[in-house]
Amino acid sequence: MRILSVGWFRKTSNTSFHRHEALKKHSTYIDKVEAGPTSLSLAYRIAFRSFQMGLPVKLPDQMDVNKKIRTLITQNGYDIVWIDKGLTVDASTLLFIKKKLPNAKIVSFSPDNMALRHNQSQNYLESIPFYDYTFTTKSFILNDLMNLGAKNVNFIHKTYSENFHYPRKISNKEKERLAADVGFVGVWEKERCDSIIYLIKNGVKVKVFGDGKWNEYQDKYDNLTILPGLFSEDYPKALQTFKISLCFLRKMNYDQQTARTMEIPACGGFMVAERTEEHLELFKEGKEALFFSSNEELLEICKYYLSNEEERKNISNAGLKRCQASGYSNEKTVEKMLNIVLGLK
């Protein structure tokens, strides 16, 4: 199978990179087009802001993604053109692919809620009808995507990478730097910040790896440590070394599950996540992960399991086994998606 893969591949912790690596395992030949700029230009920022204000302004193609796609399509034949999110991919480029390679399948994948404007672009909205298959990790937006013109819309759960998210041998120096009673890795949002402050005000020590607005809380509370975000192998190591690893959902995306949902248990971490129907389907509550619906319940869980190491270990081990047994990996999930595209499932 010959694949052209388009996405953001610069960081080894990027899920787009992990999907590309999974695609490589299922291809006989693969090319890639890097769509992620090292920094966003002023023109890009202005265009994005204008689009968010409701104007039909397209994002500038800083990385010449469309030109590179057209060049490769002209030079090589592909069975599948896989586009991760594709905010700067133009409809005219997809039509070019269809003209040059009428038998190729064009696939759209995004881990974000693409029914919401803050995740979209004008380029994306104009391109939606020309994708042959659309995959989303949001079970509740299938009809929304179809109303935008998407065809063959499929829901796929979040995933972890077998080559990146796994239990590691961790040195004592790494433990000193990364370990925490309760830890969280991620961006600031009000609800999750409120939950963390509730914990620290009730005697629980929390370590946060995050940038931006988190820096405003540096040295503000005795029980709170703020450190820079993690984007290397320190990320899975941290999830493994936290006694309790918090998994919050993005309220602005109405998430039912998130990347951390799979990554924490896959790394051998003890996950405490927000309670949702999808979380309860993915992991057995109290056996493979813990869930909470209020700050009071979160505090109760943290205090109990910080004092019960053996139970934490048993649940962490069970969560890891569930990830493996249920096929939550990128490799298994990408294989499932490719089978759908090829009509094998």
Predicted ranges, named:
Residues 82:
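N-terminal Rossmann-like NAD(P) cofactor-binding module of classical short-chain dehydrogenase/reductase
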Residues 258, 289-295, 304-309:
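Conserved acidic donor-binding segment of nucleotide-sugar-dependent glycosyltransferases
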Residues 330-345:
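C-terminal alpha-helical cap of glycosyltransferases
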Residues 311-326:
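A short, well-ordered alpha-helix in the C-terminal region of glycosyltransferases
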Residues 94-101, 200:
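Surface-exposed amphipathic alpha-helices with a cationic face
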Residues 1-45, 51-53, 61-71, 75-76, ...:
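Nucleotide-sugar donor-binding catalytic core of glycosyltransferases
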Residues 104-119:
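A short, histidine- and acid-enriched strand-loop-helix "catalytic/donor-clamping" loop
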